[in-house]
């Protein structure tokens, strides 16, 4: 009986002005305990003007390096995927890095089920310049065909680029990524793939996601404290404006892809799945321009309505009560009161010895 052919993996690193991080990213791939003959490394440079090129040249023919004019992450990923030859394509941003065992873990997961379209996993994050690794809280991981899992679409969280790997034959059905997505372009892929193939989640920390000043997604952006930060930082305001636009464009792009491929976008869970980008975009916009009471009330009402199918009746009562309460206290006071409530809840749980 013949043995199965070893899986071949393309590691696709997209980068832009990450010269001070890129070597750590590449080295984290080269030091993986994975046969080199089963791996190719592609670096797509989206027009860096720092020393990225010089740093990458040191690696010689171990790296396939593609330099292009600046067009955003979607254009970089589209180019890289078109050049990929592996059966599996694993992503890595130039400012993040992998941990030992990453490649072998995802390759094994794909080999378990030939139908699996995407494998993703848990991760650490670190805030520069600190070396402390922390775990993101409140994120869910799923395995299976998401539309068949009760509330699967509503509870599905999108993970960072460096945690994602796709079967190339499935990935090609999701292309092209809309090139208006200059950042977080992989969200289009991980949002669409769940409708055409099962996914698999590995509950291991196999990647480090780096948070630094140039990172667009480095805070929540939907509380009064964020408003105060943005008011004194023009560069941060510019990044947040781009975040608002990009988040909306992701939702629009996913909706168009679903309609083009014959999916029912009016199915309640699909409609709620798409609505999350509008709600997230609105929340980020509020950090730029705090909303009036009526608009904030409408936002909270939409949150309650579209998340309602995954709530218990008690949660629904609380959410709707909060929405109507916002009419009396307004945006800033609502978040201050909510922060106080959560702090009190954490203190009580700590006193009772609960995690």
Regions found by a protein language model. Give the residues of each.
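Short aromatic/hydrophobic "clamp" motif used to bind/position activated sugar donors
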Residues: 89
